[in-house]
Amino acid sequence: MLEYRKLTSIEDPLFAQMHRLMQEVFPPEEVLAFKLWEEPLRDPGIQVFVAVSDGAVVGATEYRYVPEFRVEMTDFTIIGRSGLGIGRFLLKQREKHLRELAAASGAESLGMFAEIYNPEDAAGSLSVRGVLPMHPAVRREVLSHLGFRKLDLDYVHPSWDHEGKAVRGLDFCFRPADDETASLPASLPAGFLRWYYAALPNKPAEWEEMMKKLEARESVALLPI
């Protein structure tokens, strides 16, 4: 049976297992250094949970609900083994918790943001390693089924290794609460991205250029993935 366990300290042995799992499936520029996790894990607004089977971390997810923007964000989902129903388990537990967080804030969610690898991009296709469920093409199709669509912009984000590199190979996506939503006011993703990446001191010129273009727009379309 899978257990859903919250992580709040880098001293938790389960965190060391999760961090190793991240290093196995994500490229180095997407993985925050071990010691730099100490502050995020203490942040009550950041939710980091692991799926545990017989004492071993077999999956993980990080997410948040941001009342200021009335949006959710899934930072990552990791499925470490096939055949255990880990993806479904993490999804159901996360959705339940996010509904509780939104209700507690008194602000109904407009939807969820997520960065999704683009398997047609050579860099993105080679970026994620590990078990088959973590293959970019598999993940993207599953997320499409869940209702995610990509924002119409040439997306780039700052690297999480604090070196200020521009990371490509992903699309910035949104799953609207109202499935009929065809576009977003540009101020929503622009404001959210400024807030989300404020924690990283070094940002590449490519990211700043993307943000300026986004902030100059009135709206941004949601396209199929």
Which residues are covered by each model-predicted region?
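Short amphipathic alpha-helix that is part of the acyltransferase structural core
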Residues: M1-L36, V50-V52
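A conserved beta-turn-beta hairpin within the catalytic core of GNAT-like acetyltransferases
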Residues: Y65-T74, S82, A107-L110
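Active-site beta-strand termini and strand-to-loop segments that position acidic
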Residues: V52-D54, R175-P176
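Conserved beta-strand in the GNAT
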Residues: V50, A56-R64, E72-I78
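Conserved acetyl-CoA-binding loop-helix of GNAT-fold acetyltransferases
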Residues: G83-E100, S109
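A short helix-loop-beta-strand connector motif used in the catalytic cores of GNAT acetyltransferases and
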Residues: E39-V50, K165-A166
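A short, internal acetyl-CoA/4′-phosphopantetheine-binding micro-motif in the GNAT/acyltransferase core
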Residues: F76-G85, N118
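Terminal substrate-recognition subdomain of acyl/acetyltransferases
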Residues: L2-E3, L7-I10, A103-I225
